[in-house]
């Protein structure tokens, strides 16, 4: 697969209160075609929404793909690149032998990542990066829909 065959997924999570109502957004771009995904949860955390955005973006791919996943979440980046291998070795426990927070979502993300060839890119949030800004708007749409459903 050449770089032009790569799917780029921009992800973001949002939470109004932490915990509180939250939303996630993902923008998938493939050969100039865009697909927008979003959703929310009435009681969640920003970290869970960041993870959900990445999971939803990867689940939306119907076959194994070459993926560049772009996030502004240091939590997701450090988790996937540094912490995850050790958590798995320790049976989903931290270095201090505590259960991993959000283990359900980390396990699902790990499962989805293993279906694809994924490279990860961190971008600073709220700096005008078009894909990240759009993912942020989608995440906030998820929050708004959860709040209006109450």
From Swiss-Prot:
Enzyme Commission no: 3.1.26.4
Protein known as: Ribonuclease H
Upper classification of the organism: Bacteria, Pseudomonadati, Pseudomonadota, Gammaproteobacteria, Pseudomonadales
Catalyzed reactions: Endonucleolytic cleavage to 5'-phosphomonoester
Organism annotation: Ectopseudomonas mendocina (strain ymp) (Pseudomonas mendocina)
Molecular-function annotations in GO: magnesium ion binding; nucleic acid binding; RNA-DNA hybrid ribonuclease activity
Cofactor (UniProt): Mg(2+)
Gene Ontology cellular-component terms listed: cytoplasm
InterPro entries cross-referenced by the UniProt entry: RNase_H, RNaseH-like_sf, RNaseH_domain, RNaseH_sf, RNaseHI
């Amino acid at each position: 697969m050449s770089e032009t065959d790569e799917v780029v997924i921009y992800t973001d999570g949002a939470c109004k209160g932490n915990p509180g109502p939250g939303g996630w957004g993902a923008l998938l771009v493939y050969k100039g075609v865009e697909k927008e995904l979003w959703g929310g949860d009435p009681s969640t955390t920003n970290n869970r929404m960041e993870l959900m955005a990445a999971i939803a973006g990867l689940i939306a791919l119907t076959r194994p793909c070459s993926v560049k996943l772009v996030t502004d979440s240091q939590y997701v980046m450090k988790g996937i690149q540094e912490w995850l291998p050790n958590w798995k070795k320790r049976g989903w426990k931290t270095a201090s032998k505590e259960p991993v927070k959000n283990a359900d979502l980390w396990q699902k993300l790990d499962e989805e990542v293993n279906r694809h060839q994924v490279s990860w890119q961190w971008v600073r949030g709220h700096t005008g990066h078009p894909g990240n800004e759009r993912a942020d708007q989608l995440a906030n749409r998820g929050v708004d829909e959860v709040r209006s459903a109450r």
